[in-house]
From Swiss-Prot:
This is Pre-mRNA-splicing factor CWC15. Involved in pre-mRNA splicing. Associated with the spliceosome. The keyword Magnesium does not apply. Residues 119-133 have a biased composition (Acidic residues).
Length: 226
């Protein structure tokens, strides 16, 4: 192909000469002036709730720590001043805590007793279900064995049938009668270059190199053409 129809580029003209027309090559034009974003990828969404929850938890921890420090300072001040009201308050809180512990222990004991009773009933039902599943598995195993034996019998029968049909030596014609086997002759038996015994040769036969006048060719003509 020729390129005479195309305009001459600036590199071909030289440095001194400048292009008089406004034709530019596509490579000299500005390219990739805008970014292309893929449409099949979605922008990741930032979940701000998780960050807010973390900040709130940190604030709660700080407030709790500050409250504990303030309580300890108040206790120390009451001890130094000789104020017995804080001692009474502390003793009350200790008594309340002990009462709560006793109540929790009672609830735990009641729950543990209920769980033991429920677990006992579950064990009984579980034993029954295990016995049923064991019986079902035994039945399934028996069914699988029976099906396997039937399939093996069918395969053996099919093999025997195939051998009887395919192999003529295995075919049985009758108990008293002898089998009449028909062995198919090979195509090599009717060739012109078959090795024949000297006893079968007749005195009248004469050897010839002419394939058209040979005995094989004459037999072929009489069989298929004449």
């Amino acid at each position: 192909m020729t390129t005479n129809h195309r305009p001459t580029l600036e590199s071909k003209r030289g440095k001194a000469e400048s292009i008089s027309n406004t034709i530019f090559h596509s490579r000299s034009l500005p390219q990739h002036t805008s970014l292309k974003y893929r449409g099949d990828i979605r922008k990741p969404k930032v979940d701000t709730k998780i960050g807010k929850q973390a900040v709130e938890e940190l604030k709660k921890d700080l407030l709790l720590n500050e409250g504990k420090l303030e309580d300890s300072l108040k206790i120390n001040k009451s001890l130094t001043d000789g104020d017995h009201s804080m001692d009474e308050h502390i003793s009350k809180t200790i008594d309340n805590q002990e009462d709560e512990r006793d109540y929790n222990r009672q609830e735990y004991d009641e729950r543990s007793i209920g769980k033991e009773e429920y677990s006992g009933s579950e064990d009984d039902s579980g034993d029954d279900s295990e016995d049923e599943t064991a019986q079902l598995m035994e039945e399934l195993a028996k069914i699988k064995k029976e099906r396997q034996e039937e399939q093996e019998k069918l395969e053996l029968q099919n093999k025997l049938d195939k051998t009887k049909v395919s192999n003529p030596l295995v075919q049985v014609v009758g108990a008293s009668t002898e089998a009449n086997f028909k062995i198919k002759k090979s195509w090599r038996d009717s060739t012109a270059f078959k090795k024949q015994n000297s006893q079968n040769k007749n005195d009248d036969e004469t050897f010839t190199n002419d394939t058209l006048n040979s005995e094989f060719h004459q037999n072929f003509l009489t069989k298929y053409i004449r």
